[in-house]
Amino acid sequence: MSARCGSQARTLYELCDQCNITLPTLQIDCVFCKTVLKTAEVLAFAFRELYVVWRDDFPHAACPRCLDLHGKVNQYRNFRYAAYAPTVEEETGLTILQVRIRCCKCHKPLSPVEKTNHIVKKTQFFKLKDSWTGYCLHCWKKCMEKGQRSETLC
């Protein structure tokens, strides 16, 4: 892939479109450990709507292992407080459905159903630095199976 190809791309979908390649054929390195992501890892990165990182005019993504590790480091370093949906809405000036909230475990954006799940189950969202996180349904289930409370980061 040319260093110039897709230099304005923010997502893997944009990168593939600008470079005229398909997502399954994309070969991209992890920004942290420098390994080449496997096809399933590339697809998972794209599904989570994560952003491409540019280093020395080349695009990078993150492998699942590094994504998990750096996500945990981010939680510990940048946790501010936990709050219920009305507080999130008051702070942002948006409805909870308009707020971009990512899963604190897998980093995918929460769907309206997943945000509503937090409200119905009276579970808090987490403020990490300048962004809000919560749990997607998949990670919620895994966290609950471990016997951890949903009011804490697991």
Swiss-Prot record:
Keyword annotations: Activator, DNA-binding, Early protein, Host cytoplasm, Host nucleus, Host-virus interaction, Inhibition of host innate immune response by virus, Metal-binding, Modulation of host cell apoptosis by virus, Transcription, Transcription regulation, Viral immunoevasion, Zinc, Zinc-finger
Pfam families in the record: E6
Domain of life: Viruses
InterPro entries (UniProt xref): E6 (IPR001334), E6_sf (IPR038575)
SUPFAM superfamilies reported in the protein's UniProt record: E6 C-terminal domain-like (SSF161229)
More about this protein: Belongs to the low risk human alphapapillomavirus family. The cancer-causing human papillomavirus E6 protein has a unique carboxy terminal PDZ domain containing substrate but low risk E6s do not possess this domain.
Function summary: Plays a major role in the induction and maintenance of cellular transformation. E6 associates with host UBE3A/E6-AP ubiquitin-protein ligase and modulates its activity. Sequesters tumor suppressor TP53 in the host cytoplasm and modulates its activity by interacting with host EP300 that results in the reduction of TP53 acetylation and activation. In turn, apoptosis induced by DNA damage is inhibited. E6 also protects host keratinocytes from apoptosis by mediating the degradation of host BAK1. May also inhibit host immune response.
UniProt xrefs under HAMAP family: HPV_E6
Family classification: Belongs to the papillomaviridae E6 protein family.
Subunit annotation: Forms homodimers. Interacts with ubiquitin-protein ligase UBE3A/E6-AP; this interaction stimulates UBE3A ubiquitin activity. Interacts with host TP53 and EP300; this interaction inhibits TP53 activity.
Name of the protein this chain belongs to: Protein E6
Name of the encoding gene: E6
